[in-house]
């Protein structure tokens, strides 16, 4: 009878899967039938969700798959989908996406889109090819030209381009020369001179003889700058006479050294035992004058000082670089003569040999000049010893050589 009632109550019910649980004391079991145990709820997936589509569910929530540049933007009133941008793209006040354009640049926006501000004097938009192309505006006769390789410079036979540098093309057989200072002119300095940037032709000699005198005949003015073989400069007096007779230069030199006016004589064996010193005779008084030969007297007065430049000997010594050397100079060549000087006080160096040599000298302006070097070679030491005092005078020391040119006027 009990089985018949159970079937009538639920004819489609399945047989119990487990032991029927009874309500314990104080519990109310409202499940009917009381023996039925509830299984885990079945998750229902709507049939319109494609597992590979942009929508998916997580924990019963519908979600959207996002890829860059779409992102979830967290806001105070809830999350929303937005576009991630950098400084080149912005969202305007109407919520529309737009390109961010710097106000300092040449780009601008119009109703038709983005445009470019250009200088019509230097740039042009060329539409001849069917496409609007930005180009450089070239002047018709401005020496610039364009080709498939780019913009270039049009040059004639007087110019050339070397290592991407525009240069003047100089005829190797001509008188022009190119240096770091620019384009210059090579000329015969016996016939021409440059004065204040102007090339001038030397005037024809107006006299067969020209003379130059400098210093004091009494050897009482120690204005000369001499230098010892220990490379110590000192003061000395001189009297100089030079005569150019139709291209033959005769130089007569007197020298006097007074220990009371020569200046400081350094101590030490190297300095005290020095026996040689050099005097330079120069006709370039402002350009290259190591012994400080003073402005003297010219006869005739319109004679150029270049009239007293000695000619360079074919066997002249190498160029003496005044930029790298103290102006002591001792040549192994040239004329050598022996003299007996006049001494006073305790100073006595014995006889003095003098070697005279025309020497090319590179001055501080990087120009080479011909000077006459007089190297005085004392037989014994004493002149540069601070404990020895007195004077020594020698002269005339005479040197004769060809002049660089016959006497010329200014």
From Swiss-Prot:
Location in the cell: Virion; Host nucleus
Coiled-coil spans in chain: none
Pfam families: AdHead_fibreRBD, Av_adeno_fibre
Domain of life: Viruses
Region of interest (Disordered), ranges: 1-22
GO biological process, one term: symbiont entry into host cell
InterPro entries in alphabetical order: AdHead_fibreRBD, Avian_adenovirus_fibre_N, Fiber_prot_C_sf
Compositional bias of kind Basic and acidic residues: 1-10
Signals that turn on the gene: Expressed in the late phase of the viral replicative cycle.
Principal location class: virion
GO cellular component, one term: host cell nucleus
Keywords of the record: Capsid protein, Host nucleus, Host-virus interaction, Late protein, Viral attachment to host adhesion receptor, Viral attachment to host cell, Virion, Virus entry into host cell
Reported function: Forms spikes that protrude from each vertex of the icosahedral capsid. Interacts with host receptor to provide virion initial attachment to target cell. Fiber proteins are shed during virus entry, when virus is still at the cell surface.
UniProt miscellaneous comment: All late proteins expressed from the major late promoter are produced by alternative splicing and alternative polyadenylation of the same gene giving rise to non-overlapping ORFs. A leader sequence is present in the N-terminus of all these mRNAs and is recognized by the viral shutoff protein to provide expression although conventional translation via ribosome scanning from the cap has been shut off in the host cell.
Family to which the UniProt record says this protein belongs: Belongs to the adenoviridae fiber family.
Domain notes: The tail region anchors the fiber to penton base capsomers, whereas the shaft, built from several repeated motifs, allows the knob to protrude from the virion.
Subunit record text: Homotrimer. Interacts (via N-terminal tail region) with pentons.
Protein name: Fiber protein 2
């Amino acid at each position: 009878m009990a089985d018949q009632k159970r079937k009538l109550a639920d004819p489609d019910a399945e047989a119990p899967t487990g032991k029927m649980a009874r309500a314990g004391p104080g519990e109310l079991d409202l499940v009917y039938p009381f023996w039925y145990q509830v299984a885990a709820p079945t998750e229902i997936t709507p049939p319109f969700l494609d597992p590979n589509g942009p929508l998916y569910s997580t924990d019963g929530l519908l979600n959207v798959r996002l890829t860059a540049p779409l992102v979830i933007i967290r806001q105070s009133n809830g999350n929303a989908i937005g576009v991630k941008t950098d400084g080149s793209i912005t969202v305007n006040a109407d919520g529309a996406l737009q390109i961010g354009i710097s106000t300092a640049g040449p780009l601008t926006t119009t109703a038709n889109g983005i445009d470019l501000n250009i200088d019509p004097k230097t740039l042009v938009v060329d539409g001849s090819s069917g496409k609007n192309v930005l180009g450089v505006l070239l002047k018709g006769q401005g020496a610039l030209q364009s080709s498939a390789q780019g913009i270039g410079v049009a040059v004639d036979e007087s110019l050339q381009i070397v290592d991407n540098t525009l240069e003047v093309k100089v005829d190797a057989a001509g008188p022009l020369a190119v240096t770091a200072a620019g384009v210059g002119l090579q000329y015969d300095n016996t016939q021409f001179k440059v004065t204040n940037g102007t090339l001038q032709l030397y005037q024809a000699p107006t006299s067969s003889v020209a003379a130059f005198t400098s210093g004091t005949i009494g050897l009482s003015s120690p204005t000369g700058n001499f230098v010892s073989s220990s490379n110590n400069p000192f003061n000395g007096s001189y009297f100089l006479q030079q005569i150019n007779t139709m291209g033959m230069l005769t130089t007569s030199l007197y020298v006097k050294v007074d220990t009371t006016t020569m200046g400081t004589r350094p101590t030490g064996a190297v300095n005290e035992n020095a026996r040689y010193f050099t005097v330079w005779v120069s006709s370039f008084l402002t350009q290259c004058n190591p012994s400080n030969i003073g402005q003297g007297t010219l006869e005739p007065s319109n004679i150029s000082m270049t009239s007293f430049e000695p000619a360079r000997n074919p066997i002249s010594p190498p160029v003496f670089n005044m930029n790298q050397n103290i102006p002591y100079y001792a040549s192994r060549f040239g004329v050598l003569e022996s003299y007996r000087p006049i001494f006073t006080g305790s100073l006595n160096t014995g006889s003095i040999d003098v070697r005279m040599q025309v020497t090319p000298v590179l001055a501080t302006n990087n120009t080479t000049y011909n000077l006459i070097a007089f190297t005085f070679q004392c037989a014994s030491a004493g002149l540069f010893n601070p404990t020895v005092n007195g004077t020594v005078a020698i002269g005339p020391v005479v040197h004769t050589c060809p002049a660089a040119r016959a006497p010329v006027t200014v």
